[in-house]
């Protein structure tokens, strides 16, 4: 495998600018938002537009964040407001559709379990009785949209929010007439232009497992190798299976989804990680959407035609 610097799950390795005939000077705007490091790379002349894109990220963070007590979602979960605004409601509806699609393996009502596991701080796994108690306060079927009701649950949009925001950013850049953009929202990558993108190995930090060529699309990777703790030789990670209330235990070590719709790619990367290689068939429900799975055994499984379509090369 080829050694690389950094540990992002997806790495835009090289930009190809055919329209201009040569590569222009580039600028990258970096910020901490959406509970992660984000970067937006554009031609240098478009730097101010990239800075405005960061402001757009922060606007949506005030809608969808679970860690900001003033966000619209936090106030909805806390009962301070009873009905979400149009964009929050739309994203909740999208999340519910994926919950139904996976028969509840993917579930946007896992806030109590997310809080219980608290991967950033926890050193030992919770007791089974604690997990059972948290599960009693979950269940996507309890949420209704008309009239709106959480049904005693709390919403966590962590598996769809960054994808939704990436779609909004693409719309913004298109409206501004800006091309040749890489938006990296912590592993959710929106590409406007043609790029070679690297997929990080889930087994060795800083190494590429594969590279692929992408054009005007989105790529999202989910894996268990960045946010986790270990206890008694067992790794406990942040991707939870709603059916068990515990860390997902499929055959997947890493999942990458490519789709023109970033919110679909975001949700599917999590859903397929939970379901494992059997979940690859979910991509057939969505136009021009493909996925690859690096299994725990080091095998590479993809949707049909993935390697040819994206000029995939295993390192």
Pin down the residues of each PLM region.
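Mature catalytic core of soluble alpha/beta enzymes
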Residues: 2-315
């Amino acid at each position: 495998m080829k050694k690389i610097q950094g540990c992002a799950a997806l790495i835009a390795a090289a930009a190809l600018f055919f329209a201009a005939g040569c590569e222009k000077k580039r600028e990258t705007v970096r910020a901490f938002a959406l509970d992660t490091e984000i970067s937006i790379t554009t031609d240098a002349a478009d730097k101010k537009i990239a800075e405005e894109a960061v402001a757009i990220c922060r606007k949506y963070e005030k809608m969808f964040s679970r860690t900001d007590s003033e966000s619209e979602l936090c106030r909805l979960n806390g009962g301070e407001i009873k009905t979400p605004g149009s964009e929050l409601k739309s994203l909740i509806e999208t999340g519910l559709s994926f919950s139904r699609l996976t028969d509840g393996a993917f579930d946007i009502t896992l806030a109590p379990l997310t809080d219980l596991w608290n991967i950033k701080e926890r050193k030992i796994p919770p007791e089974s009785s604690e997990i059972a108690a948290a599960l009693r306060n979950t269940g996507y079927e309890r949420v209704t949209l008309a009239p709106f009701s959480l049904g005693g649950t709390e919403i966590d949009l962590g598996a769809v929010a960054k994808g939704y925001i990436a779609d909004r950013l693409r719309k913004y850049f298109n409206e501004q007439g800006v091309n040749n953009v890489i938006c990296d929202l912590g592993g959710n990558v929106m590409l406007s232009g043609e790029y070679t993108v690297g997929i990080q190995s889930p087994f060795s930090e800083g190494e590429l497992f594969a590279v692929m060529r992408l054009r005007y699309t989105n790529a999202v990777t989910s894996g268990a190798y960045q946010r986790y703790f270990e206890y008694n030789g067992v790794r406990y990670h942040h991707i939870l299976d709603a059916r068990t209330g515990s860390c997902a235990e499929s055959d997947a070590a890493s999942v990458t989804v490519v789709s023109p719709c970033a919110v679909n790619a975001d949700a599917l990367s999590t859903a397929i990680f939970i379901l494992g290689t059997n979940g690859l068939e979910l991509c057939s429900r969505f136009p021009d959407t493909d996925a690859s799975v690096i299994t725990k055994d080091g095998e590479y499984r993809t949707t049909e035609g993935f390697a040819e379509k994206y000029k995939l090369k295993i390192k």
